[in-house]
Amino acid sequence: MPREFPLERTRNIGIMAHIDAGKTTTTERILFYSGTTRKLGETHEGASQMDWMDQEKERGITITSAATTCQWLNHRVNIIDTPGHVDFTVEVERSLRVLDGAVAVFCAKGGVEPQSETVWRQGDKYKVPRMAFVNKMDRQGADFFNVMQMMIDRLAANPVAVQLPIGSEEEFTGIIDLVKMEATIYLDDVGQETKIVEIPEELKELAVEYREKLVEAVSETSEELMMKYLEGEALTEEELVKGIRQGTINVQITPVYCGSAYKNKGVQLLLDGVVAYMPSPLDIPAISGIDADTQEEIERHADDSEPFSALAFKIMADPYVGKLAFFRVYSGTLDAGSYVLNSTKGKKERIGRILQMHANTRAEIPTVYAGDIAAAVGLKDTTTGDTLCDPTDAVILESMVFPEPVISVAIEPKTKAGQEKMGVALQKLAEEDPTFKTYTDEETSQTIIAGMGELHLEIIVDRMMREFKVEATVGKPQVAYKETITKAVEVEAKYAKQSGGRGQYGHVKIRMIPQEPGIGYEFTNSTVGGSIPREYVPAVDQGIQGAMVNGILAGYEVVDFKVELYDGSYHDVDSSEMAFKIAGSMAFKEGMRKASPALLEPYMKVEVVTPEDYMGDVIGDLNSRRGQIEGMESRSGAQVIKAFVPLSEMFGYSTDLRSKTQGRATYSMHFNHYAQVPASISEKIMTGK
């Protein structure tokens, strides 16, 4: 089957936003207008097409990025709906890796909210071209221009209006197109009947002013247009469109649209914009990877004739077909039934069937081409972030880096029979989500689950019950503390057993040096003159790494230190790798005791949005939780407090905040850094463990 849509008519976009900005509703409307859905699903009625997991329908939030494909103006648009809740930032992060562009949805009233900033920064990190959609223009307090200003102040973005709203709140009746300089008026409440008219008299001056701003912003994207602009020549509509497209793709400008997805206003025009201004796979730089054989850097271009390469960006357990691996094809083509190499793991895999997804219905397709997003059935060893490629031309694409979990709870099944089922369920859920870990606590033999926040773990437990029918009881949340050293020391350790028979002998001298927070562990060898033979050096490193899993204060992992192996001795007959491994571990434990060990705890960056009346209470409460207030600002009638607070003090915060502010304040938090625990508190942790 030949390619249905050429590459230049393919768009891979994400829809990203803060919770409740109307992201899922916007995606729904896109699917409706592009003829993919028969009826509209309302998120607040729990019937949305994209939110297809039970928990999502119940909570009205999007948890997993559903990948969907639709058609508009003879283009294929692949859409990834990303979650807006901070516990699921990994979903956003991994979708942004495989997209070519994104539509950021902002609420016309709330504007740039905390999660919008997080998501926007992730977009900056991957240099994703973006356009903005100011949604909910029909809401009380909607203010298009305020949102534009907030994008400049809070996101350091360069928003450029390509549309202006006609009226707002109840009076939102149409949209001005600043490129064509005409207006679309909505004649009914549901946005079905429209009429193109001249720009209303009272808005002409404003439209001319913003058209001028648009032309100026566009002229800065190329020298040719700049010359024309400076000479006072008018830009043609064609030049303007080309300039907006170029500026968007180069991440110089962010075109801003407006509308009300719920009332069906502005969505078709937004789709026109996606086709006109979002990049095709040909517009973005080639993806670079490492040649699996030579280890040299190579590039893969969006071209069907190049060797096949793809990135698996999501694994999902599907009740009907088993394990589904969503992947983005960067180069080449792939047929169902063929073999690929998972170059990350060095394993060959057979692709059973290839499915193109629409929220949670699917169509089987025989072939995928460069630039496509699809899901494969039959991949056993593939996990998130793995590269799939042509077995005869192996490449490893840059993988994704996921944050470590910061919160853990003990979990046990309510019945004996549930034990095995729970093991299977947790393993499947961990395969899907790289930020979710599960392990057995060696001391207590309890099963521990760890993740990015309380909501994250709640949803895991919920899914176990719904999808795997395992009921479980959950313990109190535990914080992932770490240990470190605070001063440099030199230690030596000798492991010798030489009484009769084959002996053991290993002798090491090491320096342990504290590192900057977040650096992790580093090992260097500076021995000279063969005092320790080369083949035993890795064993010393292994011994230290084995011992650092359990620190001496409270048994937590030891981080942020450097070990220099600078001397030692060996025995021709009795030395072995094992002996040096044990000597390394003994030296580490001795060094740890001498190096003034300290406990570290995770600090969260917390942002609370509260009405002014409760500000004193909220700040007082954060201080009592050992919070460090970082700053305050006012935002559309509310006060925003930013602080760093230890995670251990944040359990149950949402309930406390609700009662302190009568439910009027909201907060978001995400992991920021590890810092030393004050002595008085570390005492409690050590005795309480």
Curated annotation (Swiss-Prot):
Its main location: cytoplasm. GO terms for molecular function: GTP binding; GTPase activity; translation elongation factor activity. It is found in: Cytoplasm. Catalyzes the GTP-dependent ribosomal translocation step during translation elongation. During this step, the ribosome changes from the pre-translocational (PRE) to the post-translocational (POST) state as the newly formed A-site-bound peptidyl-tRNA and P-site-bound deacylated tRNA move to the P and E sites, respectively. Catalyzes the coordinated movement of the two tRNA molecules, the mRNA and conformational changes in the ribosome. The keyword Membrane does not apply. Gene3D superfamilies: 3.30.230.10, 3.30.70.240, Elongation Factor G (Translational Gtpase), domain 3, P-loop containing nucleotide triphosphate hydrolases, Translation factors. Pfam families: EFG_C, EFG_III, EFG_IV, GTP_EFTU, GTP_EFTU_D2. This is Elongation factor G. GTP binds at residues 17-24, 81-85, 135-138. Belongs to the TRAFAC class translation factor GTPase superfamily. Classic translation factor GTPase family. EF-G/EF-2 subfamily. The keyword Cytoplasm applies. Residues 8-282 form the tr-type G domain. SMART domains: EFG_C, EFG_IV. One of its GO terms (cellular component) is cytoplasm. One of its GO terms (biological process) is ribosome disassembly. Keywords: Cytoplasm, Elongation factor, GTP-binding, Nucleotide-binding, Protein biosynthesis. HAMAP family: EF_G_EF_2_B. It comes from Alkaliphilus metalliredigens (strain QYMF).
